[in-house]
């Protein structure tokens, strides 16, 4: 996923994660597309939650980028999109406590995503799951494979 030096590559990323049951065995999948090249990523965890898998997919996808990029990241997880675009600044200000004063759930993964996102310019887009978005369906299948291949 690289381009000639000088210009930041534009990368489209789709991510998904899930569990069956939730909590339980889970999987995540990601698709990275840059200049017509595609890279699929997937993995799983024997005991997790759907939210952890959604966050893991985003972290893994961003960590796979080898240089600063202009990224459009598509997710069907409102939890991921809202956390990264609306909630995290308050969490950081409150030393990783939510508005109720409790520790933020999945703090380790939120911190991992924020660190991986630093070198990039990212537009976080929400897509409705199972609504015909071909690449969203594709990463859903990757996440299922990640869970099944545990």
From Swiss-Prot:
Q: Which InterPro entries match?
A: RNase_H (IPR050092), RNaseH-like_sf (IPR012337), RNaseH_domain (IPR002156), RNaseH_sf (IPR036397), RNaseHI (IPR022892)
Q: Which PROSITE patterns match?
A: RNASE_H_1 (PS50879)
**Which gene underlies this protein?**
rnhA
- Role summary: Endonuclease that specifically degrades the RNA of RNA-DNA hybrids.
- Reaction equation(s) it catalyzes: Endonucleolytic cleavage to 5'-phosphomonoester
Report the EC number(s), separated by commas if there are several: 3.1.26.4
Which residues participate in Mg(2+) 2 binding? 16, 140
Q: Which NCBIfam families match?
A: PRK00203.1
Task: Say which enzyme class the record assigns.
Answer: hydrolase
UniProt-listed Pfam families:
RNase_H
**Similarity comment:** Belongs to the RNase H family.
Keywords from UniProt, A to Z, are: Cytoplasm, Endonuclease, Hydrolase, Magnesium, Metal-binding, Nuclease
- Describe cofactor binding as the record notes it: Binds 1 Mg(2+) ion per subunit. May bind a second metal ion at a regulatory site, or after substrate binding.
Q: Which domain of life is it from?
A: Bacteria
Q: Which cofactor does it need?
A: Mg(2+)
What is the protein named? Ribonuclease H
Q: Does the keyword Cytoplasm apply?
A: yes
Query: Where in or outside the cell?
Result: Cytoplasm
Could you give the subunit structure recorded for this chain?
Monomer.
One GO biological-process annotation of the entry reads: DNA replication, removal of RNA primer
What residues does the RNase H type-1 domain cover? 7-148
- Gene Ontology CC terms: cytoplasm
One GO MF term, please?
A: magnesium ion binding
Q: Which residues bind Mg(2+) 1?
A: 16, 54, 76
């Amino acid at each position: 996923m690289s381009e000639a030096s000088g210009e930041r590559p534009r990368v489209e990323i789709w991510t998904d994660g899930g569990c069956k049951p939730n909590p339980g065995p889970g999987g995540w999948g990601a698709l990275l597309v840059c200049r017509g090249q595609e890279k699929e990523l997937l993995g799983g965890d024997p005991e997790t939650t759907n939210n952890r898998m959604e966050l893991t997919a985003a972290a893994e996808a961003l960590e796979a980028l080898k240089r600063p990029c202009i990224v459009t990241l598509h997710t069907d997880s409102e939890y991921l999109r809202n956390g990264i675009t609306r909630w995290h600044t308050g969490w950081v200000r409150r030393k990783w406590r939510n508005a109720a004063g409790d520790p933020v759930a999945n703090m380790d993964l939120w911190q991992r995503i924020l660190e991986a996102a630093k070198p990039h310019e990212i537009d976080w887009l929400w897509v409705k799951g199972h609504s015909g978005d071909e690449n969203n369906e594709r990463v859903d299948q990757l996440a299922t494979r990640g869970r099944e291949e545990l």
